[in-house]
Every structure is written in structure tokens, then in C-alpha cells.
Design a protein with these regions (language model features):
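Short coil turns that delineate tetratricopeptide repeat
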Residues: 22, 56, 90, 124, ...
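Start-of-helix register in tetratricopeptide repeats
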Residues: 26, 60, 94, 128, ...
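Register position in tetratricopeptide repeats
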Residues: 3, 37-38, 71-72, 105-106, ...
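Canonical positions in the second alpha-helix
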Residues: 16-17, 50-51, 84-85, 118-119, ...
């Protein structure tokens, strides 16, 4: 029922079942999922802990608990839960990605890098984690390492849809003295993301610094037009 957005009906069904079978782990697992869908993360965490009390060696329960803590912003507890999950099964790459994300959010960038580098990458996972790994290096001000990662990623995938990858790449080019490369990347990004607020801001500033007032004005007008259409903007246009 929960999968077809009938959360109230699902919750009622689960509660009726638990009244009859209060120790049924399948029903409690469904309740935990349903509470998460409803946005009651605190109660979902409580139920998940009850599940772990019954089966402390379940990778799935610890993974769920870590994910719930990450949603609530309690990254320290999320990391702890993920560590327990990994002792049960260390082959879950999605779990490692989430753990690395929580380490990043907890400002433990060196450890996040270790976890990212420990992930067995397929092509799809490589595309997902390389920008995240680069962001860790940027936080550590190791712009050269981040530059190498992002340059290779963009070389292999010329039509990436994540504007933040280009923005971080441009920053790394600037920080490492590759001004021509930064300019070329900015031009490419402006073509791929013509309504992106941050890219338009960078474009206008670059033209202004280069003394091209006409193009700076054009870019600024495009920026104002994009800002006027905020209600139609996708989140990526602000990244």
C-alpha cells in the first residue's frame, strides 16, 4: 500500500497487524518504512532500533538506521550505524557511498576520501562518486588533485548534467593557475546550462574583468532574466 501512496491506509493495516502479532518483524519493518514515507523520522528511528534489538546482525536494519539518521542530520550516529552494517556485510557499495557522504557532512574529509577510494567502482558509480571525492579535496584545498579527477571525468563524459561539476572544475582551474582552461570550461558550461544562476554570474564577472563590457552586460541581462523566472527554475540552476 505504501508504494502506491496510500500511507494512511497502510499505516492502519500495519497497526492492526501489530495488534495481533506485536513481535512480527516484517510488520515492524513495514511500519518503519511507512513512518519514513510520512516524514516521521524520529518514530521510524525508534522502530528501527526495536528491529535491531530483535536482530542485531541484520545489515539491512543497520543500513536503514544509518540512512534515517543521515536524513535527520545526525551524521555521527549515521556513521556509527553504517559501521555496524559493514561488520555484517562489507560488500554494499551504496552503504559506503552514504557513509562517505556523512563523513563529508561531518567535515571529516580525509576519512571520507578513504571510504570513497575503498568503493569498488563500476562506470555508473565512478560518475557518481568522482565529483563527491573532488569536493573533499576542494575542502582540503588540494585543488590539483580535485582538478585531475574532474578533468578526467569531463574528458570521459562531455555531456554531464550536473552543473556543480563544471563550477568546481572551473574553480580548480583558477586555483591552479589554469586561466585559459577555466575560461574554456566556463564557455562550455554556459552553453550546457544557459539559465544557471551561478554560471551566468561567473560569466558576467569574467567578461567584466576582461574589459568586455558589452558581453558583460549581455550576461548580466541573461542573469536578471533567469532571476525573474525563479518560480520556473530547477534546483540545478542555482548550483
Amino acid at each position: 500500500l505504501g508504494d502506491v501512496e496510500m500511507t494512511e491506509e497502510a499505516h492502519d493495516f500495519i497497526n492492526r497487524g501489530l495488534m495481533l502479532f506485536p513481535d512480527n518483524l516484517i510488520l515492524k519493518d513495514e511500519l518503519c518504512y511507512n513512518l519514513e514515507i510520512e516524514g516521521d523520522i524520529k518514530r521510524a528511528i525508534e522502530v528501527c532500533n526495536e528491529l535491531i534489538d530483535k536482530n542485531p546482525y541484520s545489515n539491512d536494519y543497520w543500513f536503514t538506521l544509518g540512512r534515517l539518521y543521515s536524513i535527520s542530520g545526525d551524521y555521527e550516529k549515521a556513521i556509527e550505524a553504517f559501521d555496524f552494517a559493514l561488520t555484517c556485510d562489507d560488500s554494499n557499495e551504496e552503504l559506503k557511498i552514504l557513509k562517505a557522504y556523512c563523513l563529508y557532512m561531518n567535515e571529516n574529509y580525509e576519512k571520507a576520501i578513504e571510504v570513497y577510494n575503498d568503493i569498488a567502482t563500476t562506470d555508473d558509480i565512478h560518475i557518481r562518486i568522482t565529483p563527491l571525492l573532488a569536493e573533499c579535496y576542494i575542502k582540503l584545498e588540494n585543488y590539483e588533485k580535485a582538478y585531475v579527477l574532474l578533468k578526467e571525468l569531463l574528458r570521459q563524459n562531455r555531456q554531464l548534467k550536473d552543473s556543480s561539476i563544471y563550477i568546481n572544475y572551473i574553480r580548480c582551474c583558477v586555483e591552479t593557475g589554469r586561466d585559459k582552461e577555466a575560461s574554456d570550461a566556463l564557455m562550455q558550461a554556459s552553453r550546457l546550462f544557459p539559465k544557471n544562476i551561478r554560471i551566468l554570474s561567473l560569466l558576467a564577472l569574467t567578461y567584466l574583468e576582461n574589459g568586455d563590457e558589452h558581453k558583460a552586460m549581455e550576461a548580466t541581462e541573461r542573469l536578471f532574466t533567469a532571476l525573474d523566472q525563479v518560480e520556473d527554475k530547477q534546483q540545478e540552476d542555482f548550483e
